[in-house]
């Protein structure tokens, strides 16, 4: 009754992957949706096709006649639409609060962690879909199962990524929480690593008495907080865990491993995606699916048919005898995982990482981790930092990393044109474009030139 009072939603920054997902769900629920962003992209095109009114550019008049205004964390406090909405007395809420409201309407599974959220959420969603559970899904990427980052299901089940970057994951009323790992990330929001870990303690302890959290026991960050957890946890890992992967084999076309639960073999799993990190992601999805009482043969068959979300070790094509991949990874841990995954698949090829650093703050705080990593890779083409919404108050640049690496195989590339020329010189290599900024379309553009 009360929620029907509000029918007209406006999203400031609607083109973002998280904002667009919520907007799609509301459209499918029958609400009127409009939104603004600074540029067109594929998700905006999909929103238009679904019936959303989209404005390119922000303007105060865009919020007139709306009832609820949702804004993303990337939106400035002095954004003209945000200020006008407050002046008009409209309901103004953050993306995190809007997601929390969706969780109140459903029984939720929230997947968090510094790395692996999108793939783990995608796996759980795919298994649930194959099992006929008809979930509502919100993912930080385009899942090939649905061809979208959001799907409205008919059941009470909601499966969603939970964003720790701004602390909004603590607002979610979920029945099952997943923590894939806890790493040094989002230092611009959190005071330090200990502050990040405390947030995850609260997240895990947020589950109700009838719920549980599924956590990666092999991760040092997770292990360091276990003494502070007073709610039910289920662990997974390779070294140990309630759910454990053993007999792992990396082949050129698949990854195989056996799954054990408390010492008893449950299944033999075959994945079509490479990497030890995806074994961990699969273990998390198996643990959650088992909690949901999905039969083991269904889990096995679903994971065998699973295709990862776009920009997650996504194969783009072949050019000049080189294989081209694309990945969203922008943290040293993620780059290392992707590099090792491709090495396990292409043991005799050079892996060339084309990396666009994302945010000045992340580059500044993690520069030593980036430098140590780059020293160990076959070859790195390093682009300028993509600042996102940040000003460069840190005085940091990609050349600072180049100077610290001091390695011939780590090269600064100042432009896309020069990058493409340098890539054309390579033969029989695996090229992976990595980053969360404007590099997102470069791999496809290069493959077509």
Curated annotation (Swiss-Prot):
List ligand-binding residues for ATP: 113-119
Q: In which pathway does it act?
A: Cell wall biogenesis; peptidoglycan biosynthesis
| Highest taxon, organism lineage | Bacteria
**Pfam families named in the record:** Mur_ligase, Mur_ligase_C, Mur_ligase_M
Q: Where in the cell is it found?
A: Cytoplasm
Q: What is any one GO biological process for this UniProt entry?
A: peptidoglycan biosynthetic process
Major location (coarse): cytoplasm
Note the HAMAP family from the entry: MurC
- Family stated for the protein in its record: Belongs to the MurCDEF family.
Supply the name of the protein. UDP-N-acetylmuramate--L-alanine ligase
């Amino acid at each position: 009754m009360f929620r029907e009072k509000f029918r007209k939603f406006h999203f400031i920054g609607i083109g973002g992957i998280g904002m667009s997902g919520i907007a799609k769900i509301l459209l499918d629920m029958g609400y009127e949706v409009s939104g603004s962003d600074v540029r067109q992209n594929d998700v905006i095109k999909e929103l238009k096709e679904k019936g959303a009114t989209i404005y390119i550019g922000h303007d105060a008049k865009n919020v007139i006649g709306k009832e609820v205004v949702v804004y993303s964390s990337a939106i400035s406090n002095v954004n003209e639409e945000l200020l006008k909405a407050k002046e008009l007395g409209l309901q103004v809420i953050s993306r995190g609060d809007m997601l929390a409201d969706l969780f109140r309407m459903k029984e939720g599974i929230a997947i968090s962690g510094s790395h692996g959220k999108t793939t783990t959420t995608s796996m759980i969603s795919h298994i649930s879909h194959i099992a006929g559970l008809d979930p509502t899904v919100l993912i930080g990427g385009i899942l090939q199962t649905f061809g979208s980052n959001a799907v409205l299901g008919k059941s009470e089940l909601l499966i969603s990524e939970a964003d720790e970057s701004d602390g909004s994951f603590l607002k979610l009323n979920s029945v099952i929480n997943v923590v894939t790992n806890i790493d040094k990330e989002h230092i611009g929001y959190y005071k330090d690593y200990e502050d990040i870990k405390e947030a995850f303690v609260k997240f895990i302890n947020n589950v109700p008495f009838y719920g549980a959290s599924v956590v990666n026991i092999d991760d040092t960050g997770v292990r360091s907080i276990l003494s502070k957890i007073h709610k039910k946890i289920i662990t997974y890992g390779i070294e140990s865990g309630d759910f454990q992967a053993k007999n792992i084999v990396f082949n050129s076309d698949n990854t195989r491993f056996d799954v054990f639960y408390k010492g008893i073999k449950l299944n033999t799993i075959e994945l079509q995606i490479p990497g030890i990190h995806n074994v961990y992601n699969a273990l998390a999805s198996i643990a959650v699916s088992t909690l949901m009482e999905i039969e083991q043969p269904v889990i096995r068959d679903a994971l065998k048919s699973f295709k990862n979300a776009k920009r997650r070790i996504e194969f783009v094509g072949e050019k000049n005898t080189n294989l081209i991949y694309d990945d969203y990874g922008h943290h040293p841990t993620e780059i290392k995982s992707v590099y090792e995954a491709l090495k396990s698949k292409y043991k005799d090829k050079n892996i060339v990482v084309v990396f666009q650093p994302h945010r000045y703050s992340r580059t500044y705080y993690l520069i030593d981790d980036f430098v140590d990593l780059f020293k160990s890779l076959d070859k790195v083409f390093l682009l300028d930092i993509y600042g996102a919404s940040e000003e460069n108050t840190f005085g940091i640049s990609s050349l600072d990393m180049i100077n610290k690496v001091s390695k011939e195989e780590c090269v600064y590339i100042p432009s896309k044109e020069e990058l493409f020329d340098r890539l054309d010189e390579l033969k029989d290599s695996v090229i992976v474009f990595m980053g969360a900024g404007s590099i997102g379309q470069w791999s496809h553009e290069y493959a077509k030139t």
